[in-house]
Amino acid sequence: MRRASLIVFLSVIAAFASRPPVIATAAPEVTFTRDVAPILHARCVVCHRPGEVAPMALLTYQDARPWARAIKDKVVARQMPPWFADPAVGAFANDPRLSAEDIATISRWVDAGAPQGDPKDMPTPPRFTEGWQLGEPDMVVELPEVRIPATGTDYFPTPSLTLDLKEDRWIRAIEIRPSNRAITHHSVIFSANVSAMSAMSSTGMFDVLGVWAVGTPPTVYPEGTGRWVHKGQMLRTNLHYHPNGTPQVDRTRVGLYFGKGEMKKEVAAALAGNVTFSIPPNAPNFELRSVYMVDQDINIVSFFPHMHLRGKDMKMTATFPDGRQQTLLNVPAYDFNWQLFYYPKTKVPLPRGTRVDLVAHYDNSAANKNNPDPSRAIMFGEASSTSEMMFGMFEFTADAGVSPKPSTERERMEALVASLPADSSFLIDLPFGPSGLPAVLHLPRTGEGAFYTQVLGVILPQPVAKLQWEGNTFQFNTLLRILNPAAGYYTVTGTIGDDGTVRGKLQRLGNNARPQPSFEYSGAHKPKG
């Protein structure tokens, strides 16, 4: 037995000894021409080329070599290419992120001393369209010339003009071209003959027509879809410039590309947002909320989150009529310097009755390196990037018909109360404004409640503090943020009747030495269905 075992053992040793030795082979050297240039050409040079917004070109080895270490640092940290959507939420057609393999290739190239490689391996640089990226437009609109002062705070002119159209047309694409990109932060074009927020208030839709910002390509709508521009249409603008020490001039042009035949679906825009907030000084994580109610079956085709320098993160979540929830967009590390649209690879369907909650956080502390003054309370404002904004815009098409149907303030609040528990939610009328202000009370016997009002078309949940119940009578305190002199702190009382109606009073809080106004309100349950 031992002899047999020994024979087997010796046979195994002999077999291994007779094999040729295994020689380790080194990984092939990573070179710029063969390995790195294709990555940069595919993902980076749309901005990193002469005449564009990036501070350096990366088209050639001579361009890239001085920046090799910085390139590695930026791509390893995933700061370049710029992209801020949570990769675990959704899939987007314009996601420019590098793969892990591409990042490893760039890292190996830099660590090896950034060798050039064989010039014969160098790919042909991509060809870019000079001038209009989408080709010659069907109509070019020139905005009035803007003169930007050499110094001072950021400059926000708002020129407007009327389109010279002989008939209504629909556009399949729009391209915005500032003439002086070195100082231009963004150019936003609105199609409303009134302010965009006034249009949002009256229709529930936000009439933004196009946006130019660093990293934002021209807008091309899905096949057969587009936006209307009308005879006599006024284009309003919001332009943003950075003074750079010398007087500058910009003349922005807008290229319109008309669709052919009948438009199958009109693309509309809407948003959740907040326009009445105040962020306290030195607040490191101040939260703002807003709600949008979907009042028809729609499909989302793009998202556009917007805040300013103190913006920290933003999340958009849908609660469907059956109670299911889905995160639509999550931007965990917002960067004001990059105003990006996010285009889903497939349309995102939202049925009628879906509630979209927008939650954003702001860092008004000294720890925020972009914060110009943490000692100030910060209000909503469009006229400066040192103020703040909170908008989660999205573009969509409606399932029914060609164009989405507009909605009134009351219809939007009716949709909201129908989405809440019927036994603890009431649609009420506040005695503010020429025709009253519809609002919603959500007052559960346990847990957190909310007082929903609407300002310029956006629904704002106001906190409910010290909610107390005694039988069918309740009382709570709230800060009523509305665009009305009656805005302020209130104690709200009310009684629920056996028939589901509610009546009560808002008592203004203030100096006890002076009488404060009070307002009566009434309303009722709005059961689902």
Annotate each predicted stretch with a short phrase:
Residues 1-2:
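N-terminal secretory signal peptides that target proteins for export/translocation
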